[in-house]
Amino acid sequence: MNKRIMYKFTRNFLNILNILIRFLILYLCYSGADVWNEEIPFNGNLSNGSPNLCQSGRHQSPINIMTKNLVYDHSLSTMEIEGLEKQLELVVENCGYDIRISLTGEFIQLNGGPSSYPYRIDFMQIKFGSASTQGSEHTIDGKAFPGELQIYAFNTELYNNFSDASYRPNGILAVSVFFKLGNATNKDLLGVVAAAEQTIFKGETFQLKGLELRSLLTSTHEFMTYEGSLPFPPCQETVTWIILNHPITITETELKTLRRLRVAHTLWSGSMADNFRPTQTINNRSVRTNINFRSSNEACDVRKQFSYIANIAHV
């Protein structure tokens, strides 16, 4: 009888111990916002920059944008994109801390906006949350969106590649597009999510063909802009950010697909969700916009009320 009791006790103890070990592995492998300050690799090399800039820099990204403090700048020109209609070839990769979408064929060039230089798109990244009330890196009046598409481009007039430009003045232009929760599917965003679903584990890649940027960048005329940094190590402060005023729609089903992505090579390694960096101190930087909210035109007031609604009441 005693042996039977001892056997049951031992078996139960081992089951509990196994659960605790699995929980510990999950905790240690999880790489969401709470452990963002660990050295996330940037091209596998931090030797040309200072990792400490992520903590000591005074022009870091992302930031919280207060709409009442926006500065209207009539000199900001419209951003133009050459190649919106092109059928792109992309490589979608699970980097562990992010989904990276790299252009492999056609060149897409950005002109205008806050810069007089031409910039070539190099790659895109997607930020998203474990719940639909969070996910974006930039926030508006303290409110987050369910996700954020970030498009990174480098200055082709001054530099040869993204890596070189990321350490140089006027090196990088980053375009941010917020996700807004809805029922309508954006066909090209759906294509990206479907490709990401083929890269569940870190290091997996998938080739995606036929994507057009014009459905991801539906409106580029209205934007906000500020000087900031790469939101990942080495956090170089060489980035001009453009935050588009109009979000694109993502469905809850698509978000659930993204949340299934893993940060390592096993199912229990934790979800990639909450891969956003916390907002950084603005340190007296100004955020300019080409939207004149002081205009008496009624459409401007409607735009402000609609476009800047984040997750106040489950968008």
Model feature map: region roles:
Residues 2-13, 17-315:
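Alpha-carbonic anhydrase
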